[in-house]
């Protein structure tokens, strides 16, 4: 159902783009618009991941420079039967993360320093599992294409304004009125409709990634707890890169822009409380079906809190990924974690 809906929305956006092209240049304008869309999507297909990672100043890490974070991603990718993605860290205090790449073989995940500092290993696992679900569903490609087409529609709308003004000087009567109507549609209606479609696709894919991510990590409550912590990040911490490039907001697990409100037509993401409620329902279902880890979490008020990854992955002096104090705390409680997450 999600695949069919996404396909229909993408087809609508392409038709909308061609329609704006027709308003600008008639039949030939529609054909040109189709070729432009194809060219932009071709470029985005091959280069969007590099552009976004460079835009946010992402730094690639490995098992030596960021051992625990990298190991979590590796283990989750194995559990999901996905190729090992490239792993990045963004130097930003706002807790957030995103995935990018044209397919599972050329994918990358990125987490902010704020997320690694503020979340526990379990919560980070939930977040990374969500991002891997996006990769598995090829949402990274879908959202890149929708963002590209939406941007192109806005660009054509501005061009239509200039064309419309020129035509009005050389026409009168009904033709002038028709030209004005076409300009209004191209400049305001089409970009607005494209924005709504882009946001609808984004919201649909977030719910699906939450469900699948919970299955990958094995405990929906890890992701629910992470979302609860991250949700206030857009208000508490300023994400300068995201504010300057709002077209990338849909990529993040939670909207990085300030002022994000209710679950509405104008939201890039579903309301966080709705996502958390859905994850709690999924946890209850998994517990009833015999998932021991989830059953323990439900019966004991979510999960047993463990230390975050600040010392392991952000302190260059940490030995083998742990400081002395962090190692003591992790070893003492490590037996409560699932085998794949024990350090």
From Swiss-Prot:
Compositionally biased residues, Basic residues: 325-335
Ranges where the record places region Disordered: 308-343
A Pfam family reported for this protein in Swiss-Prot or TrEMBL: Peptidase_M48
Record bears the keyword Membrane: yes
Enzyme class: hydrolase
Listed cofactors: Zn(2+)
EC number: 3.4.24.-
UniProt GO BP: proteolysis
Cofactor binding comment, as recorded: Binds 1 zinc ion per subunit.
Molecular function (Gene Ontology), one example: metalloendopeptidase activity
Transmembrane intervals: 7-24, 29-46, 145-165, 177-197
UniProt keywords, alphabetically: Cell inner membrane, Cell membrane, Hydrolase, Membrane, Metal-binding, Metalloprotease, Protease, Transmembrane, Transmembrane helix, Zinc
GO cellular component: plasma membrane
InterPro entries xref list: HtpX_protease (IPR050083), Pept_M48_protease_HtpX (IPR022919), Peptidase_M48 (IPR001915)
Active site: 131
Binding site for Zn(2+): 130, 134, 206
Top-level division of the source organism's lineage: Bacteria
Zinc as UniProt keyword: yes
Subcellular location: Cell inner membrane
Topology in the lipid bilayer: Multi-pass membrane protein
NCBIfam families: PRK01345.1, PRK03001.1
Family recorded in the similarity comment: Belongs to the peptidase M48B family.
Name of the molecule in the record: Protease HtpX homolog
Organism, as annotated: Bartonella bacilliformis (strain ATCC 35685 / KC583 / Herrer 020/F12,63)
